[in-house]
């Protein structure tokens, strides 16, 4: 998890593929 992805912060399902990892 890099650059503060949603999954990293919210711990929820990755909504943005570009922001997933």
UniProtKB/Swiss-Prot annotation:
Residue ranges, annotated region (Disordered): 1-21
Coiled-coil stretches noted in the UniProt entry, renumbered to this chain: none
Chief site of localization: secreted
Domain of life of the native organism: Eukaryota
Residue spans of biased composition, Low complexity class: 1-14
Cellular component terms (Gene Ontology): extracellular region
Subunit structure as annotated in this protein's UniProt entry: Homooligomer; disulfide-linked. May also be disulfide-linked to insoluble organic matrix.
Entry's family note: Belongs to the N16 matrix protein family.
Role noted for this protein: May be specifically involved in the formation of the nacreous layer.
Protein name per Swiss-Prot or TrEMBL: Conchiolin protein p20
Organism: Pinctada maxima (Silver-lipped pearl oyster)
Lineage of the organism: Eukaryota, Metazoa, Spiralia, Lophotrochozoa, Mollusca
């Amino acid at each position: 998890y890099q650059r503060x992805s949603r999954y990293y912060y919210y711990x929820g399902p990755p909504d943005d593929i570009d922001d997933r990892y």
